[in-house]
């Protein structure tokens, strides 16, 4: 990789790609990490600047406002992109028109605004490669992964919101992570994050007794529960997940009828979380001890 970018890796740094209201950034800062936060929604970015103003002032937090997207070509000089700002569920904002249409089918609406385009590779070059990179930007997660191809060093740990409609796309996500050198994986249910408990012997800086709320991504790195799996094992794990998606998911069999929806609601009450929920894929790099 003689032509790779040699941006330095910083063990004390985390990238929060998709800050929303700063739920995860707050956790990372309290654990003693510095954070580069990315947020496309201007109102949410302003909220985070106000909420975390002290951390910005003391240099522990930098907020990059704008939407991460791939340019159509090297000659593409577009500086803004259409952002579908979800007016019903703020965390569902996206630059992906297909995702926006899916969200409409689920009963939400969006306002289309123009936001600055953020070059993720340029940010990596400027700020360095983080210890952990949390990515959750509604359909654009793979853009960040592809940008990492250019860099010699990779984050020790990375997480993305896993595909939940097309199993082939899910396999593509795992293959892309494998291509980048990630060889250990975990599938983490996100609908029950509020029940996660930070281990007292935290391997990620220090334990701060954090209480995760709605919108949090939860634990990361070596603090995650469960065993690491290889690529074949994680794909088999997701085969089981997708069987549940086909029955209970957004486009599942039971969602198509009123009695089916009632069954899903009843089951959600019993297990005390949404059914079937959704997952983040966490990955550990082969160079990480």
Where are these regions (language model features)?
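Phosphate/nucleotide-binding beta-alpha loop and adjacent structural elements of enzyme active sites
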Residues: 1-289
